[in-house]
A protein has these predicted regions:
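PIN-domain endoribonuclease scaffold, especially VapC-family toxins
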Residues: 24-32
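A short, surface-exposed loop/turn module that caps and links secondary-structure elements
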Residues: 32-59
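Enriched for short, Lys/Arg-rich terminal
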Residues: 2-4, 11-24, 49, 56-65, ...
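Non-catalytic effector/regulatory segments
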Residues: 9-10, 38
Length: 86
């Protein structure tokens, strides 16, 4: 699938590139897994509810999540830092 990063997601990704290679490795593993199957796999995929209906999250760790959606065979990454209710 094609990948698209929102400006916030790209800034978050660059933050991990510059600050923590361990987190970056985990994020890259999750991105690979999301590409294979957006709704199943590692990181406890969870469909979000209420005002985030249509979005999914995966755990990077206890604090940080990847938030993304799938639109027309394209994965759109929304964020890579913090929790989705920030």
């Amino acid at each position: 699938m094609n990948k698209k990063f929102t400006d916030e997601a790209w800034d978050d990704y660059q933050y991990w590139v510059e600050t923590d290679k361990k987190y970056l490795k985990r994020i890259n593993q999750l991105i690979k897994d999301i590409d294979r199957n957006p709704c199943e796999g590692i990181g406890k995929p969870e469909p979000l509810k209420a005002n985030l209906h249509g979005y999914w999250s995966r755990r990077i760790d206890k604090v940080h999540r990847i938030v993304y959606t799938v639109e027309n065979k394209q994965i759109v990454y929304i964020s890579f830092r913090f929790h989705y209710d920030k």
